[in-house]
Curated annotation (Swiss-Prot):
Matching Gene3D superfamilies: Mitochondrial carrier domain
InterPro entries: Mit_carrier (IPR002067), Mitochondrial_sb/sol_carrier (IPR018108), Mt_carrier_dom_sf (IPR023395)
Lineage: Eukaryota, Fungi, Dikarya, Ascomycota, Pezizomycotina
Key word Nucleus present: no
Name this polypeptide is given: Mitochondrial thiamine pyrophosphate carrier 1
Annotated gene: tpc1
Length: 320
């Protein structure tokens, strides 16, 4: 897709787009799973790293930075601790990727049929926001399960994926699967809109540049777009994680002192009052480390998979 700078929305059949999007999400998730676990652990940590007095009566671990957190997890929980929550996350990424790319393609094609075309960046923003919002809502229960498993320490809150679904449904009801969903949609809509608008703007010019880092213009455009969009909406991502672990099991995760939060605005206000503005950006560094390669891997895998599927279709037609 890089060659010639054609747009993401113009290529592939619906089946090819769904399959390529799903595979891209699967590969990307597996590669960045350890960084995702580290990010979640840092986001759920409420005590101040610069104030030793806040560490009193803290029964859980005190993480300081990406590398030291990763080492602590390996030391206390083994190497597999870095892939906690990977099963629901893989399911989420596959479904998310398929819904996202299909919705993006469908929306942009619909916008192209309007009597008066919107400016290209506006079309990309609308399509990206629609794709992100729908994909987030459709896969949110899996996102919540991913967070809860990643937040487990050596004491297991849930013994298995099926057990977690059963327990949440029985104790918290259907609404329990959607804790923090409003923050997620509020985060992902502008994030995906900004991501795709930036990505589509950068791709044509980067497609003609030789010897780019990360192998291709698609990957570099995806990385730059992800970093810019992720930084802008990160506080809502942190709020989402804090809300996802609310409920009767709140005190049983790796950080046992997570406060009780009630809604997005209450969570934002409480974090600002007790932890300051910096509290809204805990885990941002590792989030950017994760977001950039994740988006680069996602877009590169999507492009290459789509190209391979199209080549297979052409070859099959020739054999007929």
């Amino acid at each position: 897709m890089s060659a010639g700078g054609e747009h993401l929305k113009d290529e592939g059949t619906r089946r090819q787009v769904v399959l390529a999007g799903g595979i891209a999400g699967l590969v990307s998730r597996f590669c960045v799973a350890p960084l995702d676990v580290v990010k979640i652990r840092l986001q759920l940590q409420i005590h101040s790293l610069s104030d030793p007095s806040s560490h009193r009566n803290v029964s859980g671990p005190i993480y300081k930075g990406t590398i030291s957190t990763m080492r602590a997890i390996i030391r206390e929980e083994g190497i597999t601790g870095l892939w906690k929550g990977n099963i629901p996350a893989e399911l989420m990424y596959v479904c998310y990727g398929g819904v996202q790319f299909t919705t993006y393609r469908t929306t942009t094609q619909a916008l192209a049929q309007l009597p008066h075309r919107l400016p290209q960046p506006v079309e990309s923003f609308v399509a990206g926001a629609s794709a992100g919002g729908l994909a987030t809502a459709a896969t949110y229960p899996l996102d919540l399960l991913r967070t809860r498993f990643a937040a487990q320490g050596t004491e297991r809150v849930y013994t298995s994926l099926l057990a977690s679904v059963r327990d949440i449904a029985r104790i918290e009801g259907p609404a329990g699967f959607f804790r923090g969903c409003s923050a997620a949609v509020g985060q992902i809509v502008p994030y995906m809109g900004l991501f795709f608008a930036t990505y589509e703007s950068l791709r044509p010019s980067l497609a003609t540049v030789q010897d780019l880092p990360f192998g291709s213009g698609d990957a570099l455009a995806g990385m730059i777009a992800s970093v810019l969009a992720k930084t802008g909406v990160f506080p809502l991502d942190l709020v989402r994680k804090r809300l996802q672990v609310q409920g009767p099991t709140r005190s049983r995760y790796i950080h046992r002192n997570i406060p009780e939060y009630r809604g997005v605005f209450n969570t934002l206000a409480l974090i600002l009052r007790t932890q300051g503005v910096r509290g809204l950006y805990r885990g941002l560094t590792v989030s950017l480390f994760k977001a950039a390669p994740a988006s680069a891997v996602t877009m590169w895998t999507y492009e290459e998979t789509l190209r391979a599927l199209q080549a297979m279709e052409v070859a099959a037609q020739k054999d007929e």
